[in-house]
Amino acid sequence: MEERYNPEKVEPLWQAYWNQHQTFKATEDGSKPKYYLLEMFPYPSGKIHMGHVRNYTIGDVVVRYKRMKGFNVLHPMGWDAFGMPAENAAIDNNTHPAAWTYENIRTMRRQLKRMGFSYDWDREIATCRPEYYRWEQWLFLKMLDKDMVYRKESYVNWCDHCQTVLANEQVEQDMCWRCGKPVQQKKLWQWFFRITDFAEDLLVHCDKLPGWPDNVTLMQKNWIGKSQGSEIRFPIQGIDENIPVFTTRPDTLFGSTFMCLAPEHPLVETLSRGTDQAAAVTEFTTRVLNQERSSIALEKYEKEGVFTGAWCINPVTREKMPIYTANFALMEYGTGAVMSVPAHDQRDFDFARKYGLPIKVVIQPPGEPLDPATMIEAYTGQGTLADSGEFSGLGNLEAMGAITRWLENKGLGKTTVSFRLRDWGISRQRYWGTPIPVIHCPDCGIVPVKEETLPVVLPEDAALLDNGGSPLATLDGFARVNCPVCNRADARRETDTMDTFVESSWYFARYCSPRYDKGMFDPAAVAYWMPVDQYIGGVEHAILHLLYSRYFMRVLNTLGLIDFKEPFERLLTQGMVCKETLTCPEHGFIYPDDAETVNDKVICKRCNSDVEVGRVIKMSKSKKNVIDPNALLDQYGADITRLFCLFAAPPEKDLEWNDDGVEGCNRFINRVWRLADRCKSTYIDLLPYSGVVADLKGEPKKLFIKANQTIKKVTDDIEESFHFNTAISAVMELVNAMYSADLDPDQTDMGEVALFCIENIVLLLSPIVPHFCEELWSILGHGPSIVDQPWPDYQKDALLTDEILIVVQVNGKLRSKFSVDAAVSDDFIRKAALADEQVEKYIKGKTIKKVIVVKKKLVNIVV
């Protein structure tokens, strides 16, 4: 046995063994409980980063643990391969996105295999392959047939930098989630999924996901955004049309004195056309639609608007109300129209004061009545209705229902529910994505591609455009096509591609049968494996991928393809990997390898300038506070890297990178290595202890109890909370206890217990540091693989130690501690406490009034 663990030699050997024996290949097996664990699959960016390493290590530990616990495990890996970054990188590197993507996949696959992750690589998928997106196109056609998808012209979120549309969920604080550039509003023809048809069901089931973090379900609830209220119709003066308005405050209707429409509201252009206001309205809407348009951004802007030249009628007062278009009105909320009540809404109050619009008080607070002329701010509290016709005198809460019922009886309104959630716009004006399988015919309109002709393959001869955008429209060989219905030769294929979040909304189901060619998935395989038992990924996907995946399962359920609705039973959102930034006054942010410590100062190796050590933040290429996993693997190997990722912090917390911590893990691994060598060489003719605790005594008994306590602790920490850090700490304590024990070569009991301990240490660590433990397991005389071993069990009788710790207080203050046999009497404990030399100096010469013995725990002496 070598003196130290040699990962460079050991790890490739065991990886080759696992590969040769297809150790992690998954098949359906009804005789075992199934366990499907999945980490969010990566985008093939070129190489893995420490976030990947941590995420996949967490999953791999759980999977290996579950396999040892007797579960039939599915643990697949694949690639979220379509998307703008690949297209942009291909443009920058003068190559094709496919070539760039597949080369990155090869690189990252090698890196993941080097980490020893227990994936079933036979199930590997890449979403850019036609055999994958064929079934996405097939589902699109099924949804189109059931009116679950539609096309319309609408204002959409447009990123000018990426030259494509973004879904609402892909706009983060009015910036593109990919490039961080401002998002504008642009009117385009777009395809939409009717996710709003499932808004209520998605919302209700947020409370039926006990295995999900509360913050994620809360984020989804807030994004879906259900509001109870009233829809009120305001007639437009001069034309036979109404403006529907959603409001949660029908009690203030009598105080509505003007109307505000979102700049992108379809009525804005219609109402202003031909009026003196037309030019001003056009200038205003153009300017506003090029600004940030989220509710967060609007808080930063001064509230402003323009009169459209049109008027509507308040349905209860019958008074004329001017119709404005205003920058604070949003199409994504309600109907895009706001009945403005300046006396009782601060935003409306400020707007009315700015433009000289009337303010009418309709809710009076207790005490001094409000006068619009002297008000300096809106009154938004509770009160009694005033100047509200027959409803005057009612409390405003009571009036909400009364006014809504009156409107319903008059045919002017109704009780309704509004959702913040909007239908999912999936059209993207980029090349590297799934083609949308429809044809546009001048005679037949929108014609679905025939199923038997699927997939509509993305052409490989596209010349990418330097400024972004899709080249598909310029490819006559792709875009020009005969109509499948009437055979017109001038029909055009749809040249938008699908949002890449469509691919990731069902990939987990495809893993169940990735080579199945008769449908999206083999129904029997999905019935066996789905839903995913444990999903692991970042919280940043709470209202993107995670919401879309829940929606997609409802679509598949509605189409009769599956019998469940929720894709993921449990969700773990792991923390980020963080490190301090290093800033050189000459070079800006620098990499850790470009700095060194000299005389307690951090200096730049390139210029010898003092380096500022900044805050600990998420690792990012832009800040250069990154650790290259390849360099770490070269220096320490996979297992020590894995060990640190698990030991440094609980998985749900951020992990602060610490080079000393990595070295500490290296020392621990080699302590275990030397301990195993010592046990094997010292007790060469003995077998591990297989008896019960009652047959042991003295130090072997203590060590045996400690080992059983450790087994229970590690099992509970992995099973119940994924707190691998405390599980590892427990094993470290057992290792320390073994080093402290007298491993007498002539004492059989101690030898057998020592072998029991070291074998269980290896078993407990095997999901965490698998190569290391495979090697030790083999050295200890076992085979063929530790993966096939059952998880160790503990003896319940061996969890309680024979000794108990007694704390001694004098007048309530801690003065001493001592251990005694658990079987001794309270009287013995009392006498021992009084005789303790540390206690004696606090009671000597004093009158002892009382001695209180709390059984098996504490003695309090009152003097």
UniProtKB/Swiss-Prot annotation:
It catalyses: tRNA(Leu) + L-leucine + ATP = L-leucyl-tRNA(Leu) + AMP + diphosphate. A motif ('HIGH' region) lies at residues 42-52. A motif ('KMSKS' region) lies at residues 618-622. One of its GO terms (biological process) is leucyl-tRNA aminoacylation. Gene3D superfamilies: HUPs, Isoleucyl-tRNA Synthetase, Domain 1, Valyl/Leucyl/Isoleucyl-tRNA synthetase, editing domain. Signal peptide: none annotated. GO terms for cellular component: cytosol. It holds the Pfam family tRNA-synt_1. The keyword Nucleotide-binding applies. CDD domains: Anticodon_Ia_Leu_BEm, LeuRS_core. Its EC number is 6.1.1.4. ATP binds at K621. It comes from the Bacteria. Keywords: Aminoacyl-tRNA synthetase, ATP-binding, Cytoplasm, Ligase, Nucleotide-binding, Protein biosynthesis. InterPro entries: aa-tRNA-synth_I_CS, aa-tRNA-synth_Ia, Leu-tRNA-ligase, Leu_tRNA-synth_edit, M/V/L/I-tRNA-synth_anticd-bd, Methionyl/Leucyl_tRNA_Synth, Rossmann-like_a/b/a_fold, tRNAsynth_Ia_anticodon-bd. One of its GO terms (molecular function) is leucine-tRNA ligase activity. It is found in: Cytoplasm. Belongs to the class-I aminoacyl-tRNA synthetase family. This is Leucine--tRNA ligase. It comes from Desulforapulum autotrophicum (strain ATCC 43914 / DSM 3382 / VKM B-1955 / HRM2).
